Amino acid sequence: MTSTNFRPLHDRVVVRRVESEAKTKGGIIIPDTAKEKPQEGEIVAVGSGARDEAGKVVALDVKVGDRVLFGKWSGTEVKLDGEDLLIMKEADIMGIIG
């Protein structure tokens, strides 16, 4: 997504899903039709932050490059520069991996 000029507003982030393994530990190959969409992703863009009661901008806890876990139904799916991405609020992110 480096070629796009898209920047999310406020406390929103853009997430690229990280694809899960197509094969189980036992060697069984999982077809695409049986896979659930992954709930893990990489942050590719962040907004400037939300405003607190005093009007001061509060920076987000996540940054570009962070690997995160998010809820199954979190975010809005969009296509930017031909790539399928999610736009969600930082509050929809459950945590940072690693």
Swiss-Prot record:
SMART domains: Cpn10 (SM00883). It comes from Agrobacterium fabrum (strain C58 / ATCC 33970) (Agrobacterium tumefaciens (strain C58)). The keyword S-adenosyl-L-methionine does not apply. Transmembrane segments: none annotated. It is found in: Cytoplasm. The keyword Translocase does not apply. One of its GO terms (molecular function) is protein folding chaperone. One of its GO terms (cellular component) is cytoplasm. GO terms for biological process: chaperone cofactor-dependent protein refolding. Belongs to the GroES chaperonin family. Together with the chaperonin GroEL, plays an essential role in assisting protein folding. The GroEL-GroES system forms a nano-cage that allows encapsulation of the non-native substrate proteins and provides a physical environment optimized to promote and accelerate protein folding. GroES binds to the apical surface of the GroEL ring, thereby capping the opening of the GroEL channel. PROSITE patterns: CHAPERONINS_CPN10 (PS00681). This is Co-chaperonin GroES. Heptamer of 7 subunits arranged in a ring. Interacts with the chaperonin GroEL. Disulfide bonds: none annotated. Keywords: Chaperone, Cytoplasm.
